[in-house]
Amino acid sequence: MRITFNDVKTSLGITESYDIVNAIRNSQGDNFKSYVPLATANNVAEVGAGILINQTVQNDFITSLVDRIGLVVIRQVSLNNPLKKFKKGQIPLGRTIEEIYTDITKEKQYDAEEAEQKVFEREMPNVKTLFHERNRQGFYHQTIQDDSLKTAFVSWGNFESFVSSIINAIYNSAEVDEYEYMKLLVDNYYSKGLFTTVKIDEPTSSTGALTEFVKKMRATARKLTLPQGSRDWNSMAVRTRSYMEDLHLIIDADLEAELDVDVLAKAFNMNRTDFLGNVTVIDGFASTGLEAVLVDKDWFMVYDNLHKMETVRNPRGLYWNYYYHVWQTLSVSRFANAVAFVSGDVPAVTQVIVSPNIAAVKQGGQQQFTAYVRATNAKDHKVVWSVEGGSTGTAITGDGLLSVSGNEDNQLTVKATVDIGTEDKPKLVVGEAVVSIRPNNASGGAQA
């Protein structure tokens, strides 16, 4: 992950190393220009002498080089993090991203008599909302010694090395950290049981296991893209679909080396060239047994909030300190389809999703809840419903129908629990919903 001076020239749209000095010179005032001549291929020593003549000129040069030129290069040469293609762009500071999804509505049975009574009844849309906040505020600190600046103007080759070293010192660190943070999003999502899990044998253990992995991946991709959509492939259980060209496979280098790219491309019904753009090879996952993930392009929610360079001179130490600030929002969308292919021991149930997960119910009213069980063994699992925090008269049935007491004024927690353990050692997988209570001024209550 090194930036070469050719990368610098390409980013700045220049052809010669001394063009950088001239770009800085053109942005400065008459005082700077009076000391620093127009740079050419043959006057590096004269240019260096002009820059080094006094502290004011040096400060102007270093500040422009680091704060302006360096930042432009870093923004342009930003392709070394293989997961960077999933970033969404930049949002202003102080902004929280609100992600809204409106789920499909339920069918109603036609009833002529009921129509007269309920023609003006409201049917609120099934809207779900997620929030993503800035969670990375870091900076990178490096130092430029006076001696380094003097050495830079021995030749234009030395100057090229000097500029590259300044940029690489912080760019490499920022790129590596961003890559690791984005990988961590995958592992954290998996550790929380939020991926839909497809159990596989360890693909590199045999030719048969590798073939079976490709088959399961192809079948999964087909299911993700069926036109009617599904609730099975995202952790909010909303009904959605992906388009084949929007599915991305993230896989480690060892497994990718065993796979035939042409076979994989055919599995995704894409030509080889297009498919390669949808495969991201990484150095490995931190989670044991996690072999690959298949995600929609909208799964990553990564935004840049701030990229800024600052430079300050330390006259006592005869050096400049420069700082590169990186602020980001690093998150993922639970509305987007995301599947993990996992070998080894996989829990029979990875997640229980309660829908709606947030509800407001009037005193004396009712609310129907549904549990979506993410099972990996193709079996049905019994769901046990419970409600916590309620007063006498508030209860929930075995089918998930919550009845709220007419005197209820506490916030409630509805739980759907699946036990995948044994009688001696229960292992509970729990989904929850939060219910707020609204006062009911009308007699008899009403359904929320």
UniProtKB/Swiss-Prot annotation:
Residues 348-427 form the BIG2 domain. One of its GO terms (cellular component) is T=3 icosahedral viral capsid. It is found in: Virion. InterPro entries: Big_2. Residues 107-127 form a coiled coil. Gene3D superfamilies: 2.60.40.1080. Pfam families: Big_2. Keywords: Capsid protein, Coiled coil, Late protein, T=3 icosahedral capsid protein, Virion. Homohexamer. Homopentamer. The prolate capsid is composed of pentamers and hexamers of the capsid protein. Assembles to form a prolate capsid shell of about 54 nm in length and 45 nm in width, with a T=3, Q=5 symmetry. Belongs to the phi29likevirus major capsid protein family. This is Major capsid protein. It comes from Bacillus phage phi29.
